[in-house]
C-alpha cells in the first residue's frame, strides 16, 4: 500500500497532470473535438489499455475491431471520475488508486490493493 501511495504521489508531482483531491491523477494525451462530457448514465465507446504499476498490461482493446461499449456508471469509480471530464476524441492517461479501482478484491491478473494506470480514448458518446 505504501508503494502505491508513493507511486501516485510521484505521478501527482509531474508537470502537466491534473491531480484530484481523491487521489486520481489525469494526464491529457490528446485533445478531442467534442463539446460535451458524458454523464454517469451515458453509454460510451472507448479504446483503452490497463496496466499495473510495473507496466504489465492486464486488459486492452488493442487488436479489437471495435471500441468497447460501456455505461459510465457501471465502470470502476476511477474510470467514472475520468470519463465525466472527457470529450469525444480526448485521450487521457489516468492513474487510479486502489480504493477507486478494485480495492481489496483480486481480479484475474490484478492483485488486491493495486494502483492502476489506464490509457483511455473516448471515441464516442452513444447516449447522453
What are these regions (language model features)?
Residues 1-128:
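Cross-family detector of peptidyl-prolyl cis-trans isomerase
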Amino acid at each position: 500500500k505504501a508503494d502505491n501511495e508513493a507511486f501516485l504521489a510521484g505521478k501527482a508531482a509531474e508537470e502537466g497532470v491534473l491531480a484530484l483531491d481523491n487521489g486520481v491523477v489525469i494526464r491529457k494525451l490528446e485533445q478531442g473535438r467534442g463539446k460535451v462530457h458524458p454523464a454517469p448514465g451515458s453509454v460510451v465507446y472507448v479504446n483503452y489499455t490497463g496496466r499495473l504499476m510495473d507496466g504489465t498490461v492486464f486488459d486492452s482493446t488493442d487488436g479489437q475491431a471495435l471500441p468497447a461499449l460501456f455505461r459510465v456508471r457501471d465502470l470502476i469509480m476511477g474510470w467514472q471520475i475520468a470519463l465525466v471530464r472527457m470529450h469525444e476524441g480526448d485521450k487521457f492517461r489516468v492513474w487510479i488508486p486502489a480504493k477507486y479501482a478494485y480495492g481489496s478484491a483480486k481480479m484475474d491478473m490484478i492483485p488486491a490493493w493495486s494502483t492502476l494506470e489506464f490509457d483511455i480514448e473516448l471515441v464516442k458518446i452513444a447516449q447522453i
